[in-house]
Regions:
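Aromatic- and glycine-rich beta-strand/loop motifs that create alpha-glucan
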Residues: 1-20
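Central hydrophobic cores of alpha-helical transmembrane segments
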Residues: 21-25, 319-332
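Secretory targeting signals
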Residues: 26-83, 92, 133-214, 235-314, ...
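Alpha-helical transmembrane segments of multi-pass integral membrane proteins
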Residues: 136, 344-398
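Short helix-to-coil transition segments within interhelical loops
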Residues: 224-230
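Hydrophobic alpha-helical transmembrane segments of integral membrane proteins
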Residues: 227, 238-243, 324-352
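Conserved small/polar residues in nucleotide/adenosyl-binding loops
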Residues: 401-402
């Protein structure tokens, strides 16, 4: 334990570590969360052509949007949808453009496009919510089931796989609860989901020197001949790497959650994720989805840390270790679209390469003849990969010692 604390203090004393943690915090928490809520994502706009020209009033817009959504009764039924669309059209007709910003028009418009494609007027430049006849918006859940079946058929997910996904979907409670959806859509679709990609860069920079740095600083001989032995030193460094990973995650996640609670509170936590993507099959509410996404990032980051430490022990060069580590994550992301679908799914099992947003998808793996929904594997395999890398990292050091 004493060696661990020494290595831990040694790591945190490095200026590059402090700079990386600060930059990561500023990028993800300040820009990616606080300013995104208050300005970039939810600040009101003077017109619908503004992108980054939003006003600095996101908190007020979010609270107004939540209050407006509550006026529709809490359950999503045909009547609720008709009322939402009718109310939007009335506000638009009255020229109440500022009031339109507090509606869930983007989410509702995606529902209309998915469930009522026959009502789309291709000659009309406006969004569907602006012109569809509310009285024709009936059979919401029957249409959703039909769209889901058609999607599975088109995706080639038939037979046993289709039935397996239906078994998962039957656990989804209906009718759906309805509150303000857009905030949760942004939170789960990008804010939390992008955390792993951000952490990968800074973990690569910090941990690449954990073992390789000893050769760079010409202290490898001292490390390998210390009275504690290379084995204990290696274990202390490995524990330090994992501890730093958890600490960085905790700093970012806790800060982001505090920001989320300040701006959004807990309103809408019990809505199903189907409000974001209708054909999702996961029986999860928003809170459960957020917990999954954070767990995905944490376990993936631990797995990635294991890979970085293995490369650092084997390569013994800071720069090369960093490049190889980043290639592990960003390389598959860049080439995935050019690969066969099954190979894309396999690459998703690499730590931090896959996406926590797979909970919105219907991807499955078939292992030894048994179907497994992809989110189950995406949260377990990456951390196992990182842990399995540790014996090889220690072995690399032992070979050098010999």
């Amino acid at each position: 334990m004493e060696l661990f604390w020494l290595e831990h203090k040694k790591l945190w004393r490095k200026k590059i570590v402090k700079i990386c943690v600060l930059l990561c915090f500023v990028y993800y928490v300040i820009f990616g969360s606080i300013l995104s809520f208050q300005w970039f994502g939810f600040g009101s706009s003077d017109d619908y052509t503004s992108a980054f020209g939003n006003n600095f009033d996101g908190y007020t817009v979010i609270k107004d949007s939540q209050e407006y959504a509550l006026s529709f009764g809490g359950e999503l039924t045909d009547e609720t949808l008709q009322q939402i669309v009718s109310d939007y059209q009335q506000m638009e007709a009255d020229g109440m453009e500022e009031e339109l910003e507090k509606t869930d028009w983007q989410i509702v418009n995606s529902w209309l496009g998915t469930l009522y494609p026959e009502l789309r007027d291709t000659s009309n430049y406006k969004t569907m919510i602006s012109y569809v006849d509310p009285d024709k918006l009936t059979g919401f859940y029957e249409r959703r089931q039909q769209v889901l079946d058609e999607f599975l058929e088109v995706s080639g997910q038939v037979g046993a796989e289709k039935e397996y996904l239906h078994q998962i979907e039957r656990k989804v409670e209906k009718p759906f609860r309805y509150e303000w959806v857009e905030g949760w859509s942004t939170l789960l679709g990008s804010m939390v989901a992008d955390l792993g990609v951000v952490m990968a860069l800074f973990l690569g920079i910090v941990l690449s020197s954990l073992f390789a740095g000893e050769w760079h600083d010409n202290t490898s001989t001292l490390v390998l001949t210390t009275r504690n032995g290379w084995g204990k030193i290696a274990l202390a460094k490995i524990l330090t790497g994992f501890a730093f990973t958890v600490e960085l995650f905790a700093l970012l996640a806790v800060s982001s959650i505090i920001s989320q609670l300040f701006f959004m509170g807990t309103a809408g936590w019990d809505m199903p994720i189907q409000n974001i993507k209708l054909i999702a099959v996961a029986p999860m509410n928003m809170l459960q989805a957020e917990i999954y996404e954070y767990a995905f990032v944490l376990l993936g980051a631990i797995g990635f840390a294991g890979i970085v430490m293995f490369i650092s022990a084997a390569v013994k060069n800071n720069v090369l270790t960093l490049l190889l580590s980043l290639a592990v994550v960003y390389g598959p992301m860049m080439i995935a679209e050019y690969l066969p679908y099954e190979m894309q799914k396999a690459l998703d099992l690499i730590p931090l390469v896959g996406s926590s947003t797979d909970i919105f998808r219907t991807n499955t793996f078939r292992i030894f003849g048994k179907l497994i929904w992809s989110p189950y594997l995406l949260i377990t395999i990456p951390v196992l990969i990182g842990i399995l890398c540790m014996p090889f990292a220690i072995k690399s050091l032992s070979l050098i010692h010999i």
